[in-house]
Design a protein with these regions (language model features):
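Charged structural interfaces that engage phosphate-rich ligands
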Residues: 1-419
C-alpha cells in the first residue's frame, strides 16, 4: 500500500509479469491449461488441460494386482443414491451414539452430514521425481475432504487415534525429532566399520492399505488408550470414513474401493498405525541377515519414509529388501543407501550421502554427519523485502534460514559452505 494513501493499492509486480499472469488466468478459465501447485518445492506446474484430465482419468481407472493374480479397481463410479445412503448410515450411527451418551448434542450437530457434499479429486505432480523432458511428471492423487460428508466424523476420529499412533518405537515426529535420535546414536560411540545408511520409501502407501486390515489394526491399538466410549464406536466411524469416500471429478461421482485418501484428516495417523505393524515384521525379518547380531542399529520412520542404520553386509541388505517386498501383498518398498555399488565393501573412505526429510546424512569417521538437503526443484520462494508485510516478518526470514542450517548441519564444514 502507498503510505501516502492507504486506500490506493500499488502492485508489486512489473507490468509485463502482471500481463503474463492475467493471460495464464484467462487460459485456465477457458480450460486451455490448468495450473497446479507442485507436490513439493513450492513451485507450480502448467499443464495442457486435456492432458491433465487424461492423467486423472487414467488414475481413476487404475487397478491393484491381487495375490490370486486377478485385478481389482481402486475406484468405482457411483450415483447420487449412494451418497444419500452414506449420509443415512452416518446419521443413524450418530443418533445411536447420542442416545447412548457417547457424544454430546453439540458434537452430534457438528458431525451431522445432512448438508455436506462429495469430496473433490485432483492431482499434484512430483516434479522432483525423475521423468523424461516433455513427459508429465509422476502424479500424487488427492481427495479433498473439505466440506465432505465424513469431514467432521473424520476430525473426531483423528482426535483419538492420533494419541495412539505416536506411541510405537519407530515413530518420527519431524526433523528435530530425527536430529535428537541421530545425536543419541552418535553419543553411543563410533558405528561399526562399513555401516550403511539406508532410506526406504513405501510405494503409494495410502492407496495400498487394505481397509479391513487397517481397521483391525486400529481397533487393536485403541486398547492402549482410555476412551469415553466403546472403541467399536470409533472404529465404526473410521469404517464409514474409509468405505464411503465418495468424491466428484469432471461432473462424475466415484467411490474409493481400496486404501484411503491423502485428503482425509485421520489418514496420516491411520497409515502410521498400519505401518507400525509392518515395522515390527520388517525388523524381525532383518534378524535373519545379521550374521550373529541384529544388523539394524536404528529404524525410524516418518509416515512412508524409513531411515535405517545397517551394520550387516551390502549383499545381505539387498537380500533383506528382496524379502521385505514379500512380507505384505500390497505394500512395496524402494531403497537408497550410502554404499556405491562399485565400491569395495571394505573401503572405509567417506560414503555418499542420502537424503532423509530435509537432511542429507552420511558417515564420516564412523559418526553420522548431517547437512541441509533441498530438492533440486525447490523454488526457494521467500518474501521480498519490498513486501507489504510487517518489518519483523521479513527481518526474521534470514534468521530462520540461518537457524535451520545451524540446527541441522552437524559440523562446521557443512554449516559454512556456500548454498
Amino acid at each position: 500500500m502507498d503510505p501516502q494513501n492507504r486506500n490506493k493499492a500499488r502492485p508489486n509486480l512489473p507490468k509485463d509479469e502482471i500481463e503474463a499472469l492475467n493471460e495464464l488466468i484467462k487460459l485456465q478459465k477457458n480450460k486451455v491449461i490448468t495450473i497446479k501447485p507442485c507436490d513439493k518445492g513450492a513451485g507450480i506446474i502448467i499443464l495442457d488441460f486435456e492432458a491433465y484430465i487424461t492423467s486423472c482419468n487414467n488414475h481413476l481407472k487404475s487397478e491393484q494386482l491381487q495375490p490370486d493374480g486377478s485385478r481389482k479397481p481402486f475406484y468405482s463410479k457411483v450415483d447420487l443414491p449412494t451418497l444419500d445412503t452414506a449420509k443415512t448410515k452416518i446419521l443413524s450411527l450418530l443418533q445411536e451414539a447420542l442416545q447412548n451418551g457417547y457424544i454430546s448434542k453439540d458434537e452430534f450437530q457438528a458431525m451431522d452430514p445432512s448438508e455436506k457434499t462429495p469430496g473433490r479429486f485432483y492431482e499434484l505432480f512430483k516434479v522432483h521425481k525423475q521423468h523424461e523432458p516433455g513427459e508429465t511428471p509422476p502424479e500424487r492423487p488427492i481427495i479433498s475432504g473439505s466440506g465432505f460428508i465424513t469431514e467432521n466424523i473424520s476430525l473426531f476420529v483423528e482426535h483419538y487415534i492420533k494419541k495412539v499412533s505416536t506411541k510405537h518405537p519407530s515413530f518420527l515426529q519431524d526433523t528435530p525429532d530425527f536430529l535428537r535420535n541421530i545425536e543419541e546414536i552418535n553419543s553411543q560411540g563410533p558405528l561399526p566399520e562399513n555401516s550403511i545408511l539406508v532410506s526406504i520409501d513405501v510405494s503409494a502407501l495410502y492407496t495400498n492399505i487394505p481397509q479391513d486390515e487397517g481397521l483391525n489394526i486400529v481397533e487393536s491399538a485403541l486398547d492402549d488408550i482410555s476412551l469415553p466410549f466403546p472403541k467399536e464406536f470409533l472404529t465404526s466411524l473410521l469404517e464409514l470414513t474409509l468405505k464411503y469416500n465418495i468424491f466428484e471429478f469432471n461432473s462424475e461421482l466415484f467411490l474409493q474401493l481400496i486404501g484411503t485418501a491423502m485428503g482425509i484428516r485421520p489418514a496420516p495417523s491411520y497409515a502410521d498405525l498400519f505401518m507400525a505393524k509392518i515395522d515390527k515384521l520388517a525388523q524381525d525379518l532383518a534378524s535373519q541377515f545379521g550374521e550373529g547380531i541384529h544388523p539394524i542399529r536404528m529404524w525410524k520412520r516418518f509416515l512412508d519414509d524409513i531411515f535405517i542404520i545397517w551394520t550387516g553386509s551390502l549383499d545381505n541388505l539387498h537380500n533383506f529388501l528382496e524379502d521385505l517386498n514379500k512380507i505384505h501383498p500390497t505394500i512395496k518398498f524402494t531403497m537408497n543407501h550410502t554404499k556405491n555399488e562399485n565400491e569395495n565393501i571394505c573401503n572405509c573412505a567417506p560414503c555418499p550421502a542420502i537424503p532423509f526429510l530435509d537432511t542429507s546424512a552420511s558417515i564420516q569417521d564412523n559418526k553420522i554427519t548431517l547437512d541441509l538437503y533441498r530438492k533440486p526443484t525447490d523454488r526457494c520462494q521467500y518474501l521480498l523485502t519490498s513486501s507489504c508485510h510487517p518489518a519483523h516478518v521479513t527481518e526474521n526470514i534470514p534468521f530462520s534460514l540461518a537457524y535451520r542450517i545451524v540446527r541441522i548441519c552437524s559440523v562446521p564444514e557443512t554449516r559454512e559452505k556456500p548454498r
